[in-house]
């Protein structure tokens, strides 16, 4: 339990406001139903975040930006996440999209299909809200947003 004198209290209020603003933006810029409670967000050091996401599985050396834990309905961000950086805000939006997909019980043939709308919406958000161009590799996006072997 946090109290108004606790320094974490103010940060929790700021996060609630940021998440609410991102969900309002998402509702206005997509066909997703965002009429739901806001997600819980947890911050972890990079190594702990990767351990929680990958477990003992081998993974690339590319840093994990964040993830949405579907089992616990929690967005996990690195403890280096900064609310003043447009990219970091867009990463949070990306994970909020996964939360909204999950809460709306949207069915996918595979987990990769969850990425189909996230990258374009993240790009639109960066351009529209922060005037930041993000020209991601569309072939890479296609590869990671479709089921392996066509399933």
Question: Where would I find each of the regions flagged by the language model?
Answer:
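Non-transmembrane alpha-helical segments in soluble domains
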Residues: 23, 27, 93, 119-126
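Active-site recognition of the HExxH zinc-binding catalytic motif
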Residues: 90-103
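Post-HExxH zinc-binding segment in Zn-dependent metallohydrolases
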Residues: 111-146
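Auxiliary, metal-adjacent structural segments of Zn-dependent hydrolase domains
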Residues: 12-76, 81-82, 128-131, 136-138
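Substrate-binding clefts and substrate-entry loops adjacent to catalytic sites
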Residues: 78, 100-108, 128
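Short, Lys/Arg-enriched N-terminal segments with co-localized hydrophobic residues
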Residues: 2-14
């Amino acid at each position: 339990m946090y109290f108004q004198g606790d320094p974490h209290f103010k940060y929790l209020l700021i996060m609630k406001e940021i998440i609410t603003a991102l969900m309002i933006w998402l509702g206005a810029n997509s066909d997703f139903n965002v009429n739901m409670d806001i997600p819980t967000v947890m911050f972890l050091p990079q190594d702990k975040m990767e351990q929680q996401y990958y477990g003992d599985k081998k993974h690339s050396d590319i840093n994990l930006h964040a993830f949405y834990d579907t089992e616990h309905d929690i967005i996990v961000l690195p403890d280096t996440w900064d609310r003043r950086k447009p990219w970091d805000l867009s990463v949070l939006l990306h994970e909020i999209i996964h939360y909204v997909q999950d809460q709306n019980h949207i069915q996918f043939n595979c987990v990769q299909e969850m990425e189909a709308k996230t990258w374009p919406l993240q790009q639109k958000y960066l351009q529209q809200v922060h005037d930041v161009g993000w020209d991601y590799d569309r072939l890479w996006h296609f590869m990671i947003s479709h089921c392996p072997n066509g399933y």
